[in-house]
Structures are given as structure tokens and as C-alpha cells.
Amino acid sequence: MTIMRKTHPLFKIINNSFIDLPTPSNISSWWNFGSLLGVCLIMQILTGLFLAMHYTSDTTTAFSSVAHICRDVNYGWLIRYMHANGASMFFICMFIHVGRGIYYGSYVLSETWNIGIILFLTTMATAFVGYVLPWGQMSFWGATVITNLLSAIPYIGTSLVEWIWGGFSVDKATLTRFFAFHFILPFIVTALVLVHLLFLHETGSNNPSGLDSNSDKIPFHPYYTIKDLLGVLLLLMVLMILVLFFPDILGDPDNYTPANPLNTPAHIKPEWYFLFAYAILRSIPNKLGGVLALILSILVLALFPLINSSKQHGLVYRPITQFIYWIFIANLLVLTWIGGQPVEYPFTVIGQISSIMYFSIIIIFMPIANMIENDILKLHY
């Protein structure tokens, strides 16, 4: 008799995705981050569900309800900080996951890559609307500033902003709908994750060598289930150190002040994981130009499958592109730092240079390096 997991219609799907899945035998720990993102997503949905049981999406009580969760609900402080810092862990894993995709040339699996970009954007939208919910000063002003950017769209901009706000300013209607969006978006993310996996399992995983691995595959379970479990334990350890010892280190002190439309904080800035995009937005003096640059800072990732002309897969044996890649990562860190600084000299200039570098590396320098490396290969072979 055949094993049930191989014949049962439902178990068969799980079996082919997580148990008997043929996996390259040489994938390194950089491939752990996909499963870590899955763990983060499940954790965010569960903690979010329990928070939603006690949260009220009304401007008069939202701030108090979050304080009530932290003070009066059993382990409410733990759930709240796991949710807030879990979002940071989610984005750390996502940045590493995308960075690994660029380094090892995973973008050649273009369907998986493009669904990944949509996932990235959807997760950013989820985090943005979630940041508004505690209704602190930074929540309110962050929502005002970012939604106001849509007014740069010609002709329909102002109407669009008022439509999103549900009035003439960020108010009760805005908070209620943002809560609704924040509740539904993670489930849309989950659906997209399944599509992401569907496309990935059509082609199979990439591997560090960049070579075809069909001749050397091993079952996912037990080898990679154990390997992923180690990653999960490390992730939870880092998360719990954050939650239990430094719960507010990644947050903004201004968000402990209730939202006040009459008092603007000195420096309006989003959560740390948006700072690189925020720096790119601010580096362009024109409003519409800034908005376009902000959107393009993520959509530019979709160019990787199109502009890749290298004869080799990944950057393992490509020292010139490797060098450019690490400059790109350093530049991204500079942008993140600039995004959190006030708009004054020299930060504005550094931000503008870094923004130009960000796009130039992807669109100009990497393709040139590809061509040089292809020519070097021709000389040898």
C-alpha cells in the first residue's frame, strides 16, 4: 500500500512542497530566509489577530487601546512588541532574501522574481498602514505625509488623496479603513506566497554554484527541515532579545505621544525599513519626481532579468560584479542612514549622490561589468 502522504489529494500537495521536494544538495544558509519569512508571516498574523481582539480603530480610543493592551491584557505587552519587532525581523529577512537573489542570480527565474517584487510592495503597504494604527504623533504625521504624496499625480491627485483619507484630512475614516487594509493585506500576502512557491517549484531552486543541480538533488525532509529549524531558532532568539531587552530600540519616541494635528514633530520619518526609499524620495526637489523615484526604487528590481547579459549564473565567479554588488549594499546602508537624518547640508547632498548611485549601479555599472566579464571569458576560452 502506498504511503498516504503520496496519494491523498491534500497531503500530496504538502508532500511535494515540503517533504519529497527534490532540493539541490549544496544550498547554503542564505537559502534559509525563505522559510524564515514564512515563519515571520505566520507569527505576524497570529500576534496581529490577538492584538485586533483588543484594539479599537477610533481616533479617540486607538492610542488608549494600545496602552490598555500593554498594561491590562495578559501578556499584551509581549504580543504587541512581538508584532512590532516581528515586522522588523520580517524586513531584515526580506532584504537578505532579495540580496541573496541578486548575488546568486535567482532573478533568472523571472516569474518567481516578479511575484517576489509584488510581495515586497504588498508587505511594504501592510507595514505602512499598520504603523498608522497606534495613532501616535509619528503614525499620524507619517500617514499625512506619505498619503499626501499622491496629490503629485496630475489632474486626479487631490481628489485621490481626499478619497483615500475619507475627508479633507487624516481622521477617523482614515484610521478605520487603514485598520481594515491592515487586516486583509496579510492574507493577500499569504496568497501571493503560495503563487511564489508554485512558480519556484515549477523550475526548482537555484544553488550557490549557479550550475544545473538536476544530477544531484536530495529530499527536502529531513535535510532542509532540520536546517530551517536551526534558522528559525536563531531568528526567534534574536527576536526575543529585541522584544525582552530592547523593545523600543527600532521604534520612534514620538509615537508615545498621542496624535495631535496641531503639533508637527521636528523630523517626520517612517520606520527604519523604509528609510532607504524615503531618502530617495527626499533627494529629488520635485514632488512628482520624488514619488516616481520612490516607486522606481523597488520596481527597478524587475530590470534584473531583462538587463542580465552574463554568461555565468550568479556572482560567485565574477569578481568585478561582486565588487559593484558590495558597493550597492554599502550605498543602501548609507541611504538608510540619510533617510533618518534632518533635511540639511551635508545630508541632502549625500542623499542625492547615493540616490544616483543606487540607480546607476543597477542600470549602468552592473550591465557594463557583465559585458567586461563576458569578454574576459572569451579571451580564456
Curated annotation (Swiss-Prot):
- Where is heme b b566 annotated to bind? H97, H196
Cofactor(s) recorded in Swiss-Prot or TrEMBL: heme b
Q: Where does heme b b562 bind?
A: H83, H182
Q: What is its main location?
A: mitochondrion
What is one Gene Ontology biological process annotated in the Swiss-Prot or TrEMBL record? mitochondrial electron transport, ubiquinol to cytochrome c
Q: What InterPro entries does the entry give?
A: Cyt_b/b6_C (IPR005798), Cyt_b/b6_C_sf (IPR036150), Cyt_b/b6_N (IPR005797), Cytb/b6-like_sf (IPR027387), Cytochrome_b (IPR030689), Cytochrome_b_C_euk/bac (IPR048260), Cytochrome_b_N_euk/bac (IPR048259), Di-haem_cyt_TM (IPR016174)
The UniProt note on the cofactor reads as follows:
Binds 2 heme b groups non-covalently.
Q: Which CDD domains match?
A: cytochrome_b_C (cd00290), Cytochrome_b_N (cd00284)
Q: Name one GO cellular component term.
A: respiratory chain complex III
One GO MF term on file is: metal ion binding
Which residue spans traverse the membrane?
33-53, 77-98, 113-133, 178-198, 226-246, 288-308, 320-340, 347-367
**Protein's cellular compartments:** Mitochondrion inner membrane
How does the protein associate with the membrane?
Multi-pass membrane protein
Q: Which residues bind a ubiquinone?
A: H201
**Gene3D superfamilies found in the cross-reference section:** Cytochrome Bc1 Complex, Chain C
Record's keyword terms, sorted? Electron transport, Heme, Iron, Membrane, Metal-binding, Mitochondrion, Mitochondrion inner membrane, Respiratory chain, Transmembrane, Transmembrane helix, Transport, Ubiquinone
Q: What does this protein do?
A: Component of the ubiquinol-cytochrome c reductase complex (complex III or cytochrome b-c1 complex) that is part of the mitochondrial respiratory chain. The b-c1 complex mediates electron transfer from ubiquinol to cytochrome c. Contributes to the generation of a proton gradient across the mitochondrial membrane that is then used for ATP synthesis.
- Protein family: Belongs to the cytochrome b family.
Q: Its quaternary structure?
A: The cytochrome bc1 complex contains 11 subunits: 3 respiratory subunits (MT-CYB, CYC1 and UQCRFS1), 2 core proteins (UQCRC1 and UQCRC2) and 6 low-molecular weight proteins (UQCRH/QCR6, UQCRB/QCR7, UQCRQ/QCR8, UQCR10/QCR9, UQCR11/QCR10 and a cleavage product of UQCRFS1). This cytochrome bc1 complex then forms a dimer.
Other remarks on this protein: Heme 1 (or BL or b562) is low-potential and absorbs at about 562 nm, and heme 2 (or BH or b566) is high-potential and absorbs at about 566 nm.
In Swiss-Prot or TrEMBL terms, this protein is called Cytochrome b
Annotated organism of origin = Phyllotis amicus (Friendly leaf-eared mouse)
Q: Which gene holds the coding sequence for this protein?
A: MT-CYB
